[in-house]
From Swiss-Prot:
It comes from the Bacteria. Nucleotidyltransferase involved in the post-translational modification of proteins. It can catalyze the addition of adenosine monophosphate (AMP) or uridine monophosphate (UMP) to a protein, resulting in modifications known as AMPylation and UMPylation. Mg(2+) binds at residues 249, 258. The gene is ydiU. One of its GO terms (molecular function) is ATP binding. It catalyses: L-seryl-[protein] + ATP = 3-O-(5'-adenylyl)-L-seryl-[protein] + diphosphate; L-threonyl-[protein] + ATP = 3-O-(5'-adenylyl)-L-threonyl-[protein] + diphosphate; L-tyrosyl-[protein] + ATP = O-(5'-adenylyl)-L-tyrosyl-[protein] + diphosphate; L-histidyl-[protein] + UTP = N(tele)-(5'-uridylyl)-L-histidyl-[protein] + diphosphate. PANTHER family: PROTEIN ADENYLYLTRANSFERASE SELO, MITOCHONDRIAL. This is Protein nucleotidyltransferase YdiU. InterPro entries: adnlytase_SelO, SelO.
């Protein structure tokens, strides 16, 4: 089957990019590809044949129909206007046309210098490409909207970061790479007609049902806000901290995008800061809902030339509603509740307080809770707490709450185990795969990808364990 590519972005938004070709790496070689995703997209196996070199995965060749561009956008970084940014090392190669008429961006990260590289070198390093590939696939299999990873190419090209590393490329796929920052770019350049063109593009291709509706722009922004609210709710329920929620890292489609200094909670710490460059804690775990709203407010400002203020405020309210509704639903599922009752939030907050005091492992606590038997007065979770009396008091309240619903253990446990993962991508697991890969051993990278495809399956090996001492509080930065 021949892959078909279109160039909608290039054809319809000429002011938003620079056309250019990728710059290949030295001795580039394909070290991993996403076989399941490749099969779903009907990508010929021959394209992954190592005897053909790095090929399209390393920017050495293009597939018919590809028209590479680097996109320009701007944004607020750490709450401060940063001006023009753009694809400083990534190139949108083309948009794959799928059987249902939708498209999928093929974006090559680490593809070399672009007009938007600023002081950068246009490269990505092996460490960061491995982290992004693992994170995006882990989030996908957790059921959270995200970009996808299709391939990783390693090389012998030296790249200087805090230390000297080697260059790599990641093929990232997404329904769209449209960001809040695209709109900010033209708003602050005082080109509102181009802001409106971006909105028209989004509606035409992703919300076509509203094209002929009078209030199409207000409806569109309301949906952007709602998607953002649902996304942040999903992050909070699995204990995911993005680490660098700048406006240029926010997706119009409500996707998790740009995995840098992210981290999943080990110990439950609502103030967890994954990014060691975030000295003020702006992007700490418990501040993510507020930051997302702030980012939406920045996007709303760019839309004021063609959306009424009242409509924008209604959309921002929709964000709050979507966030709280989705978060509440998901947390009730994690606790095994099938109905909503007035004391549910208090019961959850009591558990969180207990976990915070004890430094309980976030993922393991909820997974162990999902094995609770309603009639049993004891729980294996009890042994993980030092203050047994406090746990017993909470557990008595919890069991009493379970008894208010006519649901048997098997059905409740089944629901809980579908939403409480046994495995998340802990930073130490990613680091172990990176350390091996940097020595030329890709086995752990491949193994970890396989493990992350089944996050809701119990395991008795270290993939489901708490981190070892060396793996606690690993420092992660924006350097990539």
């Amino acid at each position: 089957m021949t892959l078909s590519f279109t160039a909608r972005w290039r054809d319809e938004l000429p002011a938003t990019y620079t056309a250019l070709l990728p710059t290949p790496l030295k001795n580039a070689r394909l070290i991993w590809y996403n076989d399941k995703l490749a099969q779903q997209l009907a990508i010929p196996a021959s394209l992954f044949d190592a005897t053909n070199g790095a090929g399209v995965w390393g920017g050495e060749t293009l597939l018919p129909g590809m028209s590479p561009v680097a996109q320009v956008y701007s944004g607020h970084q750490f709450g401060v206007w940063a001006g023009q940014l753009g694809d400083g090392r990534g190139i949108l190669l083309g948009e794959q046309l799928l059987a249902d008429g939708s498209t999928l961006d093929w974006h090559l990260k680490g593809a070399g210098l672009t007009p938007y590289s600023r002081m950068g070198d246009g490269r990505a390093v092996l460490r960061s490409t491995i982290r992004e590939s693992l994170a995006s696939e882990a989030m996908h299999y957790l059921g959270i909207p995200t970009t996808r990873a299709l391939s990783i190419v390693a090389s012998d090209t030296p790249v200087q970061r805090e230390t000297q590393e080697t260059g790599a490329m990641l093929m990232r796929l997404a329904q769209s790479h449209m960001r809040f920052g695209h709109f900010e770019h033209f708003y602050y350049r005082r080109e509102p007609e181009k802001v409106q063109q971006l909105a028209d593009f989004a509606i035409r291709h992703y919300w076509p049902q509203w094209q002929d509706v009078a209030e199409k722009y207000a409806l569109w922004f309301e949906e952007v806000a709602a998607r953002t609210g649902r996304l942040i709710a999903e992050w909070q329920t699995v204990g995911f901290a993005h680490g660098v929620m700048n406006t240029d890292n926010m997706s119009i489609l409500g996707l998790t995008i740009d995995y840098g200094p992210f981290g999943f909670l080990d110990d439950y710490d609502p103030g967890f800061i994954g990014n060691h460059s975030d000295h003020q804690g702006r992007y700490r775990f418990d501040n993510q809902p507020s930051v997302a709203l702030w980012n939406l407010q920045r996007l709303a400002q760019t839309l004021t030339p063609f959306i009424e203020i009242d409509a924008l405020n209604r959309a921002l309210d929709r964000y709050q509603d979507a966030l709280l509704t989705h978060y509440g639903q998901r947390m009730r599922q994690k606790l095994g509740f099938f109905t909503e009752q007035k004391d549910d939030n208090a019961l959850l907050n009591e558990l969180f307080s207990l976990m915070a005091r004890e430094g309980s492992d976030y993922t393991r606590t909820f997974r162990m809770l999902s094995h609770t038997e309603q009639q049993s007065a004891s729980s294996p979770l009890r042994d993980t707490f030092i203050d047994r009396a406090a746990f017993d008091a909470w557990f008595d309240h919890y069991r009493a709450r379970l008894r208010t619903e006519a649901v048997d253990d098997a059905l409740r446990q089944q629901q809980m185990q579908r939403v409480n993962p046994a495995i998340v991508l802990r930073n130490w697991l990613a680091q172990r795969a990176i350390d091996a890969a940097e020595q030329g051993d890709m086995a752990e990278l491949h193994r970890l990808h396989e493990v992350l495809r089944q996050p809701f399956t119990d395991r008795d090996d270290d993939y489901a364990s708490r981190p070892p001492e060396w793996g606690k509080r690993l420092e992660v930065s924006c350097s990539s």
